[in-house]
């Protein structure tokens, strides 16, 4: 990343999982995004894609310009998700400032066996 910065990188996109586990960090993706933000500064856009069942933390929301979730599980929409992330990066660069970031945590857990978007309850026609 330091090498890319020296060459004039103007945006950073990370394809993350959203539920990584690290021995010395309670919030692995939040830690990674924070470290990247510290390296690139506030003026370079930082966007990440995550699984639709990611554990999104306040820290992740605070340091990333946008977090983009896959809409399918299994993840067959990787290209579309990357395209949405690229559009957000482009918009952030055009605006020259960070947009509002919001999230709302729903009060339930869904079993992994029920998360497939190919079958009910997660599938919708």
PLM regions: where:
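Active-site histidine-anchored catalytic micro-motif
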Residues: 2-95
């Amino acid at each position: 990343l330091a090498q890319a910065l020296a060459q004039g990188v103007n945006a950073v996109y990370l394809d993350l999982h959203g539920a990584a586990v690290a021995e010395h960090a309670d919030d692995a993706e939040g830690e990674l995004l924070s470290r990247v933000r510290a390296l690139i500064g506030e003026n370079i856009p930082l966007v990440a894609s995550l699984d639709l069942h990611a554990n999104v933390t306040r820290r992740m929301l605070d340091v990333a310009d946008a977090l983009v979730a896959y809409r399918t599980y299994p993840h067959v929409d990787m290209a579309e998700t990357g395209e949405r992330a690229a559009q957000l990066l482009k918009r952030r660069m055009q605006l020259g400032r960070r947009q509002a970031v919001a999230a709302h945590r729903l009060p339930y857990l869904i079993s992994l066996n029920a998360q497939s978007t190919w079958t009910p309850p997660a599938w919708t026609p």
